[in-house]
Amino acid sequence: MTESFAQLFEESLKNIKTRPGSIIQGTVVAITKDTILVDAKLKSESKIPIDQFKNSQGELEVKVGDQIDVALDAIEDGFGETLLSREKAKRHEAWLTLEQAYKDSKTVVGLINGKVKGGFTVELEDIRAFLPGSLVDIRPVRETMHLEGKELEFKVIKLDQKRNNVVVSRRAVIESEYNAERNLLLETLQEGLIVSGIVKNLTDYGAFVDLGGVDGLLHITDMAWKRVKHPSEIVNIGDEVKIKILKFDREKIRVSLGLKQLSDDPWTKISERYPEKTKITGRVTNLTDYGCFVEIEEGVEGLVHVSEMDWTNKNIHPSKMVQVNSVVKVMILDIDEERRRISLGLKQCKNNPWMEFSKKYNKGSHVVGKIKSITDFGIFIGLEGSIDGLVHLSDISWNISGEESVKKYKKGEEVLAVVLQVDPDRERISLGIKQLQEDPFAKYVSSHKKGSLVSGTIKKIDNNVIVVSLSEHIDGLIKFLNISDEIMNVHDNKPWNKAKIGEIVEVKLNSIDKKERIIYLSILEKQELKISNDIKKNNSHKQEIDKDKNFSNAMTEAFKAAKNVD
């Protein structure tokens, strides 16, 4: 009976493939902690490690009574036991699936689980495949972090089971999907349409958004109404965004997208909301060498030029006045809605030191300050409020030239001056030092009128004029034509020879040039004046004599008439 059973069993083995590697079917008859007992109707039941029946999450995939495929390793291992493998059977199934997919050009599902030279490794159930870097996507992809760990579809483009070589492509799947989606999308896309998409890539100038078969560019300037330094401030890879189609070139299949266009333009009617000279608070968003940008509301920024930051420090660097994210008070100076530019002022929200000075000091007021600098055109004096006043060269001395008088002063020296003029709008203060004293020229001409006779001392003799000192620091000029014969020798090569330096002369004050501060004198006209005065005097005397004579004659005639009557 036993031999008969053995013979029958041997005969049954002949009817099945019993060489190692064959795939046969078995039944799960028992499950223990470490093994699973499988009956494949061979000489004995086989114990297979339980790990071969678990999935990638560590979950057991079979139960007692399940029919499963296993690979035959050996009918008898020398100890009377049959060796089976569930793992090899699964690999065999996977290869069959890959072969069918390769034959039918269908996709398979796998996971990108590592990076190797030239590409990535992909786990296709129990088979490891190679994914070239150029076939990850339609566009080059440097990082696959956002793809790793996700179930993705691939196409098998090369298969060699003997060499255990499988090459897959994700790009082929995307292209196939894109072609179908693109054709459908291209029929519906139009400018002004609001669509949804997935951010797939970021650059310095914007973000590429997958609209479902067609990529569109969301430029950085169309992300928000406010200033955006980098696209990552607004969107990130993988974000689903709602955007507006701004431009669509159907021939070149180029799509320009806009995000900010979904909200109202904050620049609309901005001049009505912020009239000039309005004072508001804002946040500093950026610093440059020429100023700082201040956000006065969401999406609206204005520039505070460096010249509008401080009343006195015109070239101060913005970083010494404000910092990024600082909240500051500014004034609206100008709005150009067309060019979307706003000029703001920081200093205008502080007291104007020039205006404060003009309120405190009037023309003629005395001020004290230290000399800050001396230039070719005058002296700058530091005044309260950290402002400067200028003493022009012409306002240093009444009698000495500015070039000479300025040499008497040194930087840092404290001086007294008179306020001549204050112009807050032009930020200028004119000061004078000579005005601390009375003008000797004005004093002299006020007491010596034109045409009067004055005396002076000859100070200098030139070929054309004689300089006469009339008073301390007051000189007069006698021109050649106004020199009398008394001091002139026409036969000499010199125009005169009798005039001597130090000689006191009496002259006529001929004319006064107040602008040039020159007094013109004349000796000739002085003599003419004397002659005229003498003639007038003689004429007056003669008239008196004639008057007396006429009176005497009248009396004589009267006596004669009286005598004849008698």
Swiss-Prot record:
Q: Give the matching Pfam families.
A: S1
| One GO CC term on file | cytosolic small ribosomal subunit
For this UniProt record, give its keywords in alphabetical order, as a comma-separated list.
Repeat, Ribonucleoprotein, Ribosomal protein, RNA-binding
Q: Could you state one GO biological process linked to this protein?
A: translation
Q: Which residues form a coiled coil?
A: none
Lineage top rank: taxon: Bacteria
Q: Which InterPro entries match?
A: NA-bd_OB-fold, Ribos_protein_bS1-like, Ribosomal_bS1, Ribosomal_protein_S1-like, S1_domain
- UniProt xrefs under SUPFAM superfamilies: Nucleic acid-binding proteins
- S1 motif domain span: 21-87, 105-171, 192-260, 277-347, 364-434, 451-524
Give the molecular function GO annotations. mRNA binding; structural constituent of ribosome
The cysteines covalently paired via disulfide bonds are none
Function, as annotated, reads:
Binds mRNA; thus facilitating recognition of the initiation point. It is needed to translate mRNA with a short Shine-Dalgarno (SD) purine-rich sequence.
Q: Which PANTHER family match?
A: 30S RIBOSOMAL PROTEIN S1 (PTHR10724), SMALL RIBOSOMAL SUBUNIT PROTEIN BS1C (PTHR10724:SF7)
Q: Please state which protein family the record places this protein in.
A: Belongs to the bacterial ribosomal protein bS1 family.
Name of this chain's protein = Small ribosomal subunit protein bS1
Organism, scientific name: Buchnera aphidicola subsp. Baizongia pistaciae (strain Bp)
